[in-house]
Amino acid sequence: MRILLANPRGFCAGVERAINIVEKVIAIYGPPIYVRHELVHNSYVVNTLRNQGVVFIEQIHEVPDGAVIIFSAHGVSKAIRKEVQSRNLTIFDATCPLVTKVHMEVARASHKGIETILIGHYGHPEVEGTIGQYNNTDGGIYLVESLEDVWQLKVKNKNNLCFITQTTFSVDKSSAIIDALRQRFPFIKGPHKQDICYATTNRQEAVRNLTMATDIVLVVGSKNSSNSNRLVELAQQTGKPAYLIDCASDIKENWLQGINIIGVTAGASAPNILVLQVILKLQSFGAESAEELRGYEEKMIFDLPRNLHVVNK
Protein backbone atom coordinates (compact mmCIF):
# COMPACT_ATOMS: atom_id res chain seq x y z
CA MET A 1 0.00 0.00 0.00
CA ARG A 2 1.11 3.54 -0.79
CA ILE A 3 0.36 6.64 1.28
CA LEU A 4 -0.33 9.95 -0.47
CA LEU A 5 -0.49 13.18 1.54
CA ALA A 6 -2.68 16.10 0.48
CA ASN A 7 -0.95 19.43 0.01
CA PRO A 8 -1.71 21.72 1.74
CA ARG A 9 -3.05 20.15 4.92
CA GLY A 10 -3.10 20.87 8.65
CA PHE A 11 -2.63 24.14 10.51
CA CYS A 12 -3.68 27.39 8.87
CA ALA A 13 -2.27 30.81 9.75
CA GLY A 14 -5.24 31.64 11.99
CA VAL A 15 -4.78 28.52 14.10
CA GLU A 16 -1.01 29.01 14.35
CA ARG A 17 -1.60 32.60 15.45
CA ALA A 18 -4.15 31.58 18.11
CA ILE A 19 -1.87 28.93 19.61
CA ASN A 20 1.07 31.34 19.51
CA ILE A 21 -0.98 33.94 21.39
CA VAL A 22 -1.92 31.51 24.15
CA GLU A 23 1.62 30.18 24.55
CA LYS A 24 3.07 33.70 24.76
CA VAL A 25 0.42 34.80 27.28
CA ILE A 26 1.18 31.74 29.45
CA ALA A 27 4.91 32.56 29.27
CA ILE A 28 4.27 36.17 30.34
CA TYR A 29 1.52 35.78 32.96
CA GLY A 30 1.83 32.15 34.01
CA PRO A 31 -1.13 29.80 34.51
CA PRO A 32 -4.02 29.74 34.88
CA ILE A 33 -5.07 31.45 31.65
CA TYR A 34 -8.75 31.41 30.70
CA VAL A 35 -9.93 30.87 27.13
CA ARG A 36 -13.52 31.47 26.11
CA HIS A 37 -14.60 28.29 24.27
CA GLU A 38 -12.08 25.80 22.85
CA LEU A 39 -9.28 27.83 21.27
CA VAL A 40 -9.54 25.73 18.11
CA HIS A 41 -11.61 22.63 17.44
CA ASN A 42 -9.00 19.93 17.96
CA SER A 43 -8.89 17.70 21.02
CA TYR A 44 -5.10 17.19 20.87
CA VAL A 45 -4.46 20.95 20.83
CA VAL A 46 -7.03 21.60 23.56
CA ASN A 47 -5.64 18.88 25.85
CA THR A 48 -2.05 20.05 25.26
CA LEU A 49 -2.97 23.62 26.26
CA ARG A 50 -5.01 22.39 29.22
CA ASN A 51 -1.90 20.59 30.48
CA GLN A 52 -0.01 23.90 30.23
CA GLY A 53 -2.51 25.63 32.52
CA VAL A 54 -5.26 26.82 30.18
CA VAL A 55 -8.81 26.72 31.55
CA PHE A 56 -11.51 26.58 28.87
CA ILE A 57 -14.80 28.22 29.83
CA GLU A 58 -18.10 29.08 28.13
CA GLN A 59 -19.56 31.59 30.60
CA ILE A 60 -17.66 34.75 31.53
CA HIS A 61 -18.78 34.53 35.18
CA GLU A 62 -16.54 31.44 35.45
CA VAL A 63 -13.48 33.72 35.18
CA PRO A 64 -12.28 35.25 38.49
CA ASP A 65 -11.58 38.98 38.80
CA GLY A 66 -8.05 39.98 37.87
CA ALA A 67 -7.53 36.97 35.58
CA VAL A 68 -6.37 36.83 31.97
CA ILE A 69 -8.91 35.83 29.32
CA ILE A 70 -8.40 35.04 25.63
CA PHE A 71 -11.09 34.92 22.96
CA SER A 72 -10.93 31.79 20.79
CA ALA A 73 -10.08 31.80 17.08
CA HIS A 74 -13.81 31.58 16.27
CA GLY A 75 -14.52 35.08 17.62
CA VAL A 76 -17.18 36.34 20.03
CA SER A 77 -20.32 38.46 19.86
CA LYS A 78 -20.45 42.13 20.79
CA ALA A 79 -22.39 41.18 23.92
CA ILE A 80 -19.65 38.80 25.12
CA ARG A 81 -16.96 41.38 24.36
CA LYS A 82 -18.90 44.04 26.29
CA GLU A 83 -19.40 41.68 29.26
CA VAL A 84 -15.67 40.91 29.41
CA GLN A 85 -14.72 44.58 29.12
CA SER A 86 -16.99 45.40 32.08
CA ARG A 87 -14.92 43.10 34.30
CA ASN A 88 -11.49 43.55 35.86
CA LEU A 89 -9.85 41.23 33.33
CA THR A 90 -6.80 41.33 31.08
CA ILE A 91 -8.03 40.60 27.55
CA PHE A 92 -6.29 39.14 24.51
CA ASP A 93 -8.09 38.42 21.26
CA ALA A 94 -7.14 35.30 19.27
CA THR A 95 -10.00 35.71 16.78
CA CYS A 96 -8.79 34.76 13.31
CA PRO A 97 -8.28 37.98 11.29
CA LEU A 98 -10.39 36.49 8.48
CA VAL A 99 -13.26 36.01 10.93
CA THR A 100 -12.75 39.59 12.12
CA LYS A 101 -13.12 40.70 8.48
CA VAL A 102 -16.55 39.04 8.35
CA HIS A 103 -17.47 40.63 11.68
CA MET A 104 -16.65 44.05 10.27
CA GLU A 105 -18.84 43.40 7.21
CA VAL A 106 -21.77 42.52 9.48
CA ALA A 107 -21.18 45.54 11.73
CA ARG A 108 -21.21 47.85 8.68
CA ALA A 109 -24.43 46.28 7.40
CA SER A 110 -26.00 46.62 10.85
CA HIS A 111 -25.02 50.29 11.04
CA LYS A 112 -26.66 50.93 7.65
CA GLY A 113 -29.75 48.86 8.44
CA ILE A 114 -29.02 46.40 5.62
CA GLU A 115 -30.60 43.01 6.26
CA THR A 116 -27.89 40.35 6.28
CA ILE A 117 -28.04 36.68 5.33
CA LEU A 118 -25.31 34.53 6.88
CA ILE A 119 -24.48 31.26 5.12
CA GLY A 120 -23.26 28.99 7.89
CA HIS A 121 -23.83 26.07 10.24
CA TYR A 122 -26.37 26.30 13.04
CA GLY A 123 -24.75 26.25 16.50
CA HIS A 124 -21.17 26.82 15.35
CA PRO A 125 -19.34 29.33 17.61
CA GLU A 126 -18.10 31.36 14.63
CA VAL A 127 -21.69 31.73 13.45
CA GLU A 128 -22.87 32.74 16.92
CA GLY A 129 -20.15 35.37 17.16
CA THR A 130 -20.89 36.69 13.68
CA ILE A 131 -24.64 36.96 14.28
CA GLY A 132 -23.76 38.80 17.49
CA GLN A 133 -22.22 41.66 15.50
CA TYR A 134 -25.66 42.73 14.24
CA ASN A 135 -27.76 44.86 16.59
CA ASN A 136 -29.98 47.03 14.39
CA THR A 137 -33.63 46.15 15.05
CA ASP A 138 -34.71 48.03 11.92
CA GLY A 139 -32.85 45.44 9.86
CA GLY A 140 -32.14 41.83 10.69
CA ILE A 141 -29.69 38.96 10.29
CA TYR A 142 -30.74 35.51 9.12
CA LEU A 143 -28.89 32.19 9.05
CA VAL A 144 -29.21 29.81 6.10
CA GLU A 145 -27.53 26.41 5.86
CA SER A 146 -29.27 24.84 2.87
CA LEU A 147 -31.15 25.59 -0.33
CA GLU A 148 -34.38 24.82 1.54
CA ASP A 149 -33.53 27.58 4.03
CA VAL A 150 -33.14 30.03 1.15
CA TRP A 151 -36.55 29.27 -0.36
CA GLN A 152 -38.28 29.47 3.04
CA LEU A 153 -36.54 32.67 4.16
CA LYS A 154 -38.66 35.73 4.92
CA VAL A 155 -37.06 39.20 4.93
CA LYS A 156 -38.37 42.70 5.53
CA ASN A 157 -37.05 44.36 2.37
CA LYS A 158 -35.81 42.20 -0.50
CA ASN A 159 -34.21 45.26 -2.09
CA ASN A 160 -31.94 45.98 0.90
CA LEU A 161 -30.04 42.73 1.40
CA CYS A 162 -26.48 41.45 1.62
CA PHE A 163 -24.97 38.02 2.27
CA ILE A 164 -21.85 36.79 4.06
CA THR A 165 -20.40 33.31 4.62
CA GLN A 166 -18.90 31.38 7.52
CA THR A 167 -15.17 31.11 6.81
CA THR A 168 -15.10 27.29 7.04
CA PHE A 169 -18.20 26.55 4.96
CA SER A 170 -18.10 24.20 1.95
CA VAL A 171 -16.98 26.09 -1.16
CA ASP A 172 -19.29 24.10 -3.46
CA LYS A 173 -22.29 24.28 -1.13
CA SER A 174 -21.88 28.02 -0.55
CA SER A 175 -21.70 28.58 -4.31
CA ALA A 176 -25.02 26.78 -4.78
CA ILE A 177 -26.63 28.72 -1.93
CA ILE A 178 -25.35 32.04 -3.28
CA ASP A 179 -26.80 31.20 -6.72
CA ALA A 180 -30.15 30.49 -5.06
CA LEU A 181 -29.99 33.75 -3.08
CA ARG A 182 -29.29 35.73 -6.25
CA GLN A 183 -32.16 33.95 -7.98
CA ARG A 184 -34.59 34.69 -5.16
CA PHE A 185 -33.28 38.18 -4.34
CA PRO A 186 -31.86 39.72 -7.56
CA PHE A 187 -30.70 42.88 -5.78
CA ILE A 188 -28.77 41.13 -3.01
CA LYS A 189 -25.17 42.25 -2.56
CA GLY A 190 -22.17 40.14 -1.57
CA PRO A 191 -18.72 40.91 -0.16
CA HIS A 192 -16.01 42.31 -2.43
CA LYS A 193 -13.95 39.20 -1.69
CA GLN A 194 -15.34 35.79 -0.72
CA ASP A 195 -15.57 35.17 3.01
CA ILE A 196 -14.53 31.50 2.89
CA CYS A 197 -10.91 31.61 3.97
CA TYR A 198 -7.92 30.72 1.81
CA ALA A 199 -7.08 27.68 3.97
CA THR A 200 -10.57 26.20 3.67
CA THR A 201 -10.52 26.70 -0.10
CA ASN A 202 -7.01 25.28 -0.50
CA ARG A 203 -7.66 22.21 1.65
CA GLN A 204 -10.90 21.42 -0.13
CA GLU A 205 -9.16 21.68 -3.51
CA ALA A 206 -6.33 19.48 -2.21
CA VAL A 207 -8.85 16.81 -1.18
CA ARG A 208 -10.37 16.86 -4.67
CA ASN A 209 -6.92 16.16 -6.08
CA LEU A 210 -6.26 13.51 -3.43
CA THR A 211 -9.44 11.56 -4.18
CA MET A 212 -8.50 11.29 -7.86
CA ALA A 213 -5.28 9.47 -6.95
CA THR A 214 -6.35 7.29 -4.01
CA ASP A 215 -8.74 4.49 -3.01
CA ILE A 216 -9.60 5.81 0.46
CA VAL A 217 -9.20 9.14 2.29
CA LEU A 218 -8.42 9.62 5.98
CA VAL A 219 -9.02 13.12 7.34
CA VAL A 220 -7.25 13.95 10.59
CA GLY A 221 -9.47 16.22 12.65
CA SER A 222 -11.87 16.34 15.58
CA LYS A 223 -15.61 15.72 15.27
CA ASN A 224 -16.46 19.33 16.16
CA SER A 225 -14.13 20.76 13.50
CA SER A 226 -16.26 22.31 10.76
CA ASN A 227 -13.51 22.44 8.14
CA SER A 228 -12.45 18.83 8.83
CA ASN A 229 -16.01 17.59 8.40
CA ARG A 230 -16.27 19.45 5.09
CA LEU A 231 -13.17 17.60 3.85
CA VAL A 232 -14.73 14.23 4.68
CA GLU A 233 -17.99 15.18 2.96
CA LEU A 234 -16.13 16.36 -0.13
CA ALA A 235 -14.17 13.11 -0.39
CA GLN A 236 -17.31 11.02 0.12
CA GLN A 237 -19.12 12.93 -2.63
CA THR A 238 -16.63 11.49 -5.12
CA GLY A 239 -17.73 7.98 -4.17
CA LYS A 240 -14.54 7.14 -2.30
CA PRO A 241 -14.67 5.86 1.29
CA ALA A 242 -13.55 8.63 3.66
CA TYR A 243 -13.21 8.73 7.44
CA LEU A 244 -12.70 11.45 10.04
CA ILE A 245 -10.12 10.36 12.60
CA ASP A 246 -9.10 12.23 15.74
CA CYS A 247 -5.87 10.25 16.02
CA ALA A 248 -4.06 7.20 14.65
CA SER A 249 -5.78 4.79 17.05
CA ASP A 250 -9.13 5.53 15.35
CA ILE A 251 -7.99 3.75 12.17
CA LYS A 252 -9.60 0.33 11.62
CA GLU A 253 -7.42 -2.18 9.78
CA ASN A 254 -10.44 -3.58 7.93
CA TRP A 255 -10.87 -0.18 6.22
CA LEU A 256 -7.72 -1.01 4.27
CA GLN A 257 -8.79 -4.37 2.86
CA GLY A 258 -8.36 -4.27 -0.92
CA ILE A 259 -6.87 -0.75 -0.75
CA ASN A 260 -3.78 0.07 -2.81
CA ILE A 261 -3.38 3.82 -2.24
CA ILE A 262 -4.33 5.60 1.00
CA GLY A 263 -4.94 9.35 0.97
CA VAL A 264 -4.25 11.33 4.14
CA THR A 265 -5.07 14.95 4.88
CA ALA A 266 -5.72 17.08 7.98
CA GLY A 267 -8.11 19.86 8.88
CA ALA A 268 -6.88 23.40 9.52
CA SER A 269 -6.86 22.85 13.30
CA ALA A 270 -5.03 19.49 13.28
CA PRO A 271 -1.28 19.53 14.11
CA ASN A 272 1.26 17.74 11.94
CA ILE A 273 2.29 15.40 14.77
CA LEU A 274 -1.07 13.65 14.37
CA VAL A 275 -0.43 13.14 10.65
CA LEU A 276 2.99 11.65 11.44
CA GLN A 277 1.38 9.27 13.93
CA VAL A 278 -1.18 8.24 11.30
CA ILE A 279 1.62 7.47 8.84
CA LEU A 280 3.36 5.27 11.43
CA LYS A 281 0.10 3.46 12.18
CA LEU A 282 -0.52 2.81 8.47
CA GLN A 283 3.03 1.54 8.08
CA SER A 284 2.40 -0.89 10.94
CA PHE A 285 -0.41 -2.24 8.75
CA GLY A 286 2.06 -2.72 5.88
CA ALA A 287 1.96 0.63 4.08
CA GLU A 288 5.07 2.08 2.46
CA SER A 289 6.62 5.49 3.16
CA ALA A 290 4.42 8.52 2.47
CA GLU A 291 4.59 10.72 -0.61
CA GLU A 292 3.27 14.28 -0.81
CA LEU A 293 1.19 15.42 -3.76
CA ARG A 294 2.01 18.64 -5.53
CA GLY A 295 0.02 21.53 -4.18
CA TYR A 296 -0.21 25.17 -3.26
CA GLU A 297 2.44 26.60 -0.93
CA GLU A 298 0.80 28.74 1.74
CA LYS A 299 2.82 31.73 2.94
CA MET A 300 0.16 33.54 4.95
CA ILE A 301 1.27 34.82 8.38
CA PHE A 302 -0.95 36.83 10.73
CA ASP A 303 0.51 39.31 13.18
CA LEU A 304 -0.07 39.03 16.93
CA PRO A 305 -2.48 41.41 18.72
CA ARG A 306 -1.02 44.86 19.32
CA ASN A 307 -1.50 44.70 23.10
CA LEU A 308 0.48 41.44 23.24
CA HIS A 309 3.36 43.12 21.39
CA VAL A 310 3.34 45.88 24.03
CA VAL A 311 3.35 43.44 26.96
CA ASN A 312 6.03 41.30 25.30
CA LYS A 313 8.54 44.17 25.09
From Swiss-Prot:
Gene3D superfamilies: 3.40.50.11270, 4-hydroxy-3-methylbut-2-enyl diphosphate reductase, catalytic domain (3.40.1010.20)
Keywords: 4Fe-4S, Iron, Iron-sulfur, Isoprene biosynthesis, Metal-binding, Oxidoreductase
Residues that coordinate or bind [4Fe-4S] cluster: 12, 96, 197
Short name of any one Pfam family annotated for the protein: LYTB
Keyword Iron-sulfur: yes
CDD domains associated with the record: lytB_ispH
Reactions catalysed according to its record: isopentenyl diphosphate + 2 oxidized [2Fe-2S]-[ferredoxin] + H2O = (2E)-4-hydroxy-3-methylbut-2-enyl diphosphate + 2 reduced [2Fe-2S]-[ferredoxin] + 2 H(+); dimethylallyl diphosphate + 2 oxidized [2Fe-2S]-[ferredoxin] + H2O = (2E)-4-hydroxy-3-methylbut-2-enyl diphosphate + 2 reduced [2Fe-2S]-[ferredoxin] + 2 H(+)
Stated name of the protein: 4-hydroxy-3-methylbut-2-enyl diphosphate reductase
Species whose genome carries this gene: Baumannia cicadellinicola subsp. Homalodisca coagulata
